[in-house]
Amino acid sequence: MIERVKGTRDFLPEEMVKRRWVFERIRERFETYGFKEVLTPTMEYTKLFELRSGEEVVKQLYAFKDKGGRDVSLRPDMTSSVARLYVNMFQTAPKPIKWYYIANMFRYEEPQSGRYREFWQAGVELIGSDKVEADAEVIALFVESYLATGLREFTVNIGDRILLDEFAKMLGVKDDIGLMRIIDKKDKLPQEDFINALKEFGLDKNGIEKVLELINIKGKPDEVLPLAEELFTSEVAKNEINRLYALIDLLEAYEVKDWIRIDLGIARGFDYYTSIVFEAIAPNDLGIGSIGGGGRYDNLIEVFGGKPTPATGFAIGIERLIPILEAKGLIPEVQIAPDVYVVPIGERMKKVAIRIATSLRKSGIKTEIELMGRKLKKAMDYANKVGVKKTIIVGEKDLERGVVTVRDMESGEQNEVKIDDIVEFMKNALKT
């Protein structure tokens, strides 16, 4: 027996109904903000991801040579692919460009709660605006996308890579990206291991204390931003803090400020982020951390050969979101069994059964027809097992009178219904 590949999953019908429900809630919200759907190839040239994705992501690539000897990889995220698409075809298009996607990604990492080697994300990319209004629009949509699924207990924590750059300069650190990678692991490592990582990086006791001070600057914007003003003194940092104040002001107008927190220790794992970054956290007992994140990446398009173009976006982690929604009972139970099961009694009734099933299907009624040649009793057993609501029994004697027998599988009640009236009867019967 061949097993499925480690870190991947098979989704059964019951699970697919739940996933589709979540996808549609999010898709609906994306489209109300004017975003349009795109989909890029599952494979890209490996160089695309090596340029600016970050050391950890590059290590996790599913990378290989194709039969032509070209280095290709399965996509680990969509932002790089969307940026490549923009550079290839849309540089002269009217701005801003507002695209969304719902797609699968691949990373070779150790499977754990909410983490798989194949996983799905739903995200948006807003290309062409460097304005704080674009950041606010994207973060507001990020919040509203979770709200659309019924989730209420979560926060969106906002940090800033420019402030982290300035912090590195304050410490005299030249390898700011290296420091950010360690800071990004602050919630993934025990504090002792985190401090040891900072020591190995080369920070002295004073530098480590400064880092610990920084990562504890988090909380409600009105409380935290004044603390940031005290910590940072450079003109660059002050300008960026003013941008954060402006962002929070706009998010209040979007009516999402209640979900917003500031966390200056957020770095995010991708090297392409340039300023504002953010991630969503929902309290849970499942061992799941961030359920999505994003930020501004103003240099990525230029790295891929395009003209300098600002951009921002986010991705929602579907594999992390769904278990939390399930644990909170937020995904409704959806009927996956057919509404109607048509059972012909005898060989001569098969075509009649097909015609009845066809008329019901054309009317939008989910209908299954008996295909296994079962006798009536076994057909009824099957109908009960799969949860069919109504069964139509097509018998020769009934047909002579132009009727069929409709059985309610829950109550056992039976009705004779004229074949010509069956569609209307079923529509009414299924409403109750």
UniProtKB/Swiss-Prot annotation:
GO biological process: histidyl-tRNA aminoacylation; L-histidine biosynthetic process
Major enzyme class: ligase
Keyword match Ligase: yes
Keywords in alphabetical order: Aminoacyl-tRNA synthetase, ATP-binding, Cytoplasm, Ligase, Nucleotide-binding, Protein biosynthesis
Chain segments annotated as transmembrane: none
UniProt GO MF annotations: ATP binding; histidine-tRNA ligase activity
Enzyme Commission designation: 6.1.1.21
Location in the cell: Cytoplasm
GO CC entries: cytoplasm
Top-level lineage group: Archaea
Keyword flag Nucleotide-binding: yes
Catalytic activity: tRNA(His) + L-histidine + ATP = L-histidyl-tRNA(His) + AMP + diphosphate + H(+)
CDD domains per the UniProt record, alphabetical: HisRS-like_core (cd00773), HisRS_anticodon (cd00859)
PANTHER family: HISTIDINE--TRNA LIGASE, MITOCHONDRIAL-RELATED, HISTIDYL-TRNA SYNTHETASE
Family (UniProt): Belongs to the class-II aminoacyl-tRNA synthetase family.
Name the record gives this protein: Histidine--tRNA ligase
Species of the source: Pyrococcus furiosus (strain ATCC 43587 / DSM 3638 / JCM 8422 / Vc1)
